[in-house]
């Protein structure tokens, strides 16, 4: 049995039958020592495989082969001229992932804790009628070629538990609410709506809810999925002429967890079905948990009736962790990997990688891999060498004076107001926001930031960061302003 054959068995456990048969089974992987070439038949297929399943393929090959490897993606079939793209190109997230030293046990990463419902295949609808009813994307799914069976939902991964979720000011409210609904589903915070940027822990929290609720009540019917899978489940129930079964499965859940709910916006047929599913569950006191990258009102194309229902319960944000929490995440991750990481190295990485937790862990993996390969300890010097491209990109992008200008323009004040001694609320709050942004987006120390804001003490900067972090949890207006400013500055 080849390494890829072993990988296929593991990958199959992580995906629905439809995903596996449609996307993974058709690709061919050629191994030449530590080089794995993934042949994807065409450019569209290659892009989709890389973006959607690249991390899964990488971690599975690492599990079966080891960490010392290179993966190339080709847009050609296995025979003929090869046009390849190495996934380690560039300094950002894909490169971090490629050098990961994390080895995931099959029992940890792929164990299924729910039994998906299987539908048997019947006649397909034609594309034109499906397109009229559902729209282009949904029609494409209905007419997609599949094998003989299809399952609802996605498996929960047992590695996602509350104990492995590092808590800080940026996520403690979301974590507390998640714990509450896992213990008493349908009683408080229904629905629980968790929003925040990519890679900040929303999926971790969501699956932790499912896993903990299973421990509290082993007989509970828990369905975890994401919006893409929910769409596939729905349109395939139409294609298989079994909508009643789809409705029975989803509407009989005790706890329904849907990740990235924003993607049902604009999918008219699916949105309508979800609306009725939501109502059925809510009226029966069943718990609904949703995640999104945006606050409900900001999801473009989402029906107003859904926005209204999302507001029935509790909406909480998950933001980028502060420096102390990022350090704690790195130290815990290193410990889980059985690696020793000096506190000063963890602090250096946390200071210089501030985009999201996923890239933070990727940077750690990169440092640990390099130190292990060179038989060195993961010192600051090793981290500096490994991450110099990341640091250069970040410093090139963000300067404190640029942050001050963007914030001043946003609040219609002058830059010199931010550096002045004025303490009026319309000046003090933007100043605190600008300081917090400077702390998050630059590698400057607290004293350096304080000096840039009129020679203020480093404790003033610390207070500003803590104040804004707390306000972002409780004040939607502040949170929205902060996210908009982050976007403007990072462009």
Curated annotation (Swiss-Prot):
Domain I is involved in oligomerization and binding regulators, domain II is flexibile and of varying length in different bacteria, domain III forms the AAA+ region, while domain IV binds dsDNA. Keywords: ATP-binding, Cytoplasm, DNA replication, DNA-binding, Lipid-binding, Nucleotide-binding. Oligomerizes as a right-handed, spiral filament on DNA at oriC. GO terms for cellular component: cytoplasm; plasma membrane. This is Chromosomal replication initiator protein DnaA. Residues 155-371 are annotated as: Domain III, AAA+ region. It is found in: Cytoplasm. It comes from the Bacteria. Signal peptide: none annotated. Belongs to the DnaA family. Plays an essential role in the initiation and regulation of chromosomal replication. ATP-DnaA binds to the origin of replication (oriC) to initiate formation of the DNA replication initiation complex once per cell cycle. Binds the DnaA box (a 9 base pair repeat at the origin) and separates the double-stranded (ds)DNA. Forms a right-handed helical filament on oriC DNA; dsDNA binds to the exterior of the filament while single-stranded (ss)DNA is stabiized in the filament's interior. InterPro entries: AAA+_ATPase, Chromosome_initiator_DnaA, Chromosome_initiator_DnaA-like, Chromosome_initiator_DnaA_CS, DnaA_C, DnaA_dom, DnaA_N_dom, DnaA_N_sf. Its main location: cytoplasm. It comes from Francisella tularensis subsp. holarctica (strain LVS). ATP binds at residues 199, 201-203.
